[in-house]
């Protein structure tokens, strides 16, 4: 009997378009000799829509439902996704997706799911909290200032200018895919950047800009996590924002990255240490800055990285000899392993 994969996609965050791309890639790559795929779309308003089922490979003309093509007659209760023995693959990015909320819902339903658990998902989603945890693990990061809604913005800007030097990067603390990120060269630009970031979150991070290459490492596993050789993001834009990643196609990837073996070893070790520090499970992508001075800074951990067939994370594992379809199978098996362990602890 085939294993059912419940594919959750869409979502309420600004990254819902990325989720659709990732989900369509997964549905086309699944090994249909082993799996059946059932898809549920989460609308921008948070409603669950039962969409398609696939027992064999979809045709090129098959497309998943989006906010523009919703069939509201197929709206269901969120709990309708439950199916005994099924594994959920929540291809959801950003808040209300990879921040622990969906993970908690799936644990209430007693369903295995791909990826990090409630704690590690919510922790890694918040950039400020992640930085504090990684500091305790002894992992180097770029200097930063945290700003929370209600703070005296003028005083915080003064703190930024005392501790950091322009240019700086301003980021919503609880957002991914470079949504809401701005580069500032002066105080006026910083004020505008803060306004933009606060549109997406009530906690904002201001980081020191560094002249650095962007290097990424893939992680796969539960308590026995393994890492990939690093890949490099090669940009034709000022910084790696949402449009550059997913809309304008202004980036290329160099896999494996052209860096020394010593640097590779440090990055892989730091990535695995960071994954363990947050209690990661299943998968993550760890992003580093490698400066022209030879400094290695961990930038962020992404617990549900972009998962299209052309995204960095699957390509990193492909370089290690694990194909995209095989990667999906391994993640499903890891999900069942972590579920069994979680259930065994409930005594």
Swiss-Prot record:
Keywords: ATP-binding, Cell shape, Cell wall biogenesis/degradation, Cytoplasm, Ligase, Magnesium, Manganese, Metal-binding, Nucleotide-binding, Peptidoglycan synthesis. GO terms for cellular component: cytosol. ATP binds at residues 161-216. Its cofactor is Mg(2+); Mn(2+). PROSITE patterns: ATP_GRASP, DALA_DALA_LIGASE_1, DALA_DALA_LIGASE_2. Mg(2+) 1 binds at residues 287, 300. Disulfide bonds: none annotated. GO terms for biological process: cell wall organization; peptidoglycan biosynthetic process; regulation of cell shape. Binds 2 magnesium or manganese ions per subunit. The keyword Transcription regulation does not apply. Residues 131-333 form the ATP-grasp domain. InterPro entries: ATP-grasp, ATP_grasp_subdomain_1, D-Ala_lig_Van_CS, D_ala_D_ala, Dala_Dala_lig_C, Dala_Dala_lig_N, PreATP-grasp_dom_sf. It is found in: Cytoplasm. One of its GO terms (molecular function) is D-alanine-D-alanine ligase activity. Mg(2+) 2 binds at residues 300, 302. Pfam families: Dala_Dala_lig_C, Dala_Dala_lig_N. Cell wall formation. Belongs to the D-alanine--D-alanine ligase family. NCBIfam families: D_ala_D_alaTIGR, PRK01966.1-4, PRK01966.1-5. This is D-alanine--D-alanine ligase. The gene is ddl.
